[in-house]
UniProtKB/Swiss-Prot annotation:
Protein name, as recorded: Enoyl-CoA delta isomerase 1, peroxisomal
Enzyme Commission number(s): 5.3.3.8
Organism of derivation: Arabidopsis thaliana (Mouse-ear cress)
Keywords tagged on the record: Fatty acid metabolism, Isomerase, Lipid metabolism, Peroxisome
Annotated function: Able to isomerize both 3-cis and 3-trans double bonds into the 2-trans form in a range of enoyl-CoA species. Essential for the beta oxidation of unsaturated fatty acids.
Site (described: Important for catalytic activity): 130
């Protein structure tokens, strides 16, 4: 599932175990519960969230085998991930994804839903695989892609050629902020970046509101109509 460690003002959320970290209802509920736990901490608005993982996968996307065995669960998983992404966007603190393995499809969307993406260069790629497996991408995935990938050419390559984007290529495309030689170096760099952000100070609530406005299209697709200045904390559980 996932674990949470607090180091001073840093919250380190880790997807644990050596599996593929498929986004099934249980894991998604665990991630949302952990985000809610962070929100309840008295220091949360002066903190930084770092999300990383064990093993060779950051996340290999939705649990497609589970969805095939029970098609109704595909709708449940999509709704739960939409709510998780909205949680991250509304979280009143900066967020960093330390991508130490493959991040595919919904797993790629999860990584890109963070403010910063740091990635190891010796293993792993960002991969929107839907074209290759002949699945139509949900409209809200496209909203995330538009909000997070500025270059039309990069969006084309990611979505319409199903490019497997390594860390160094991701830096050139503007998707990845920086690349590192190993998983350990990637996490260390994320911690260093988080500490630098904390040292700069700032009000997490103001930061979160600015992020909500910046990613307004994503919020409209994930939680419905959104008005700048309104709070999106968090009634979306009723939609699942």
């Amino acid at each position: 599932m996932c674990s949470l460690e607090k180091r001073d003002r840093l919250f380190i959320l880790k997807l644990t175990g050596d599996g593929e970290h498929r986004l099934n209802p249980t894991l998604l509920d665990s991630l949302r519960s952990t985000i809610n736990q962070i929100r309840s901490d008295p220091s949360f608005s002066q903190s930084v969230l770092i999300t990383t993982s064990d093993g060779k996968f950051f996340s290999n996307g939705y649990d497609l085998a589970l969805a095939e065995s029970n098609p109704s669960l595909s709708v449940v998983m999509d709704a739960k991930l939409r709510s998780l992404v909205a949680d991250l966007i509304s979280l009143p603190m900066p967020t960093i994804a330390a991508v130490t393995g493959h991040a595919s499809a919904a797993g790629c969307i999860l990584a890109m839903s963070h403010d910063y993406v740091l990635m190891r260069r010796d293993r792993g790629f960002l991969y929107m695989s839907e074209l290759d497996i002949e699945l139509i991408v949900p409209a809200w995935f496209m909203a995330v892609i538009r909000g997070k990938i500025g270059s039309p050419a990069a969006r084309r390559d990611v979505m319409l050629t199903a490019a497997k984007v390594t860390a160094d290529v991701g830096v050139k495309m503007g998707i990845v902020d920086s690349a590192y030689g190993s998983a350990a170096e990637t996490v260390e760099a994320a911690i260093k970046l988080g500490e630098e952000i904390v040292q700069r100070g700032g009000d997490g609530h103001v930061y979160g509101k600015m992020r909500e406005s910046l990613l307004r299209e994503v919020l409209i697709h994930t939680i419905g109509e959104y008005e700048s200045g309104s709070s999106v904390v968090r009634s979306t559980g009723s939609k699942l």
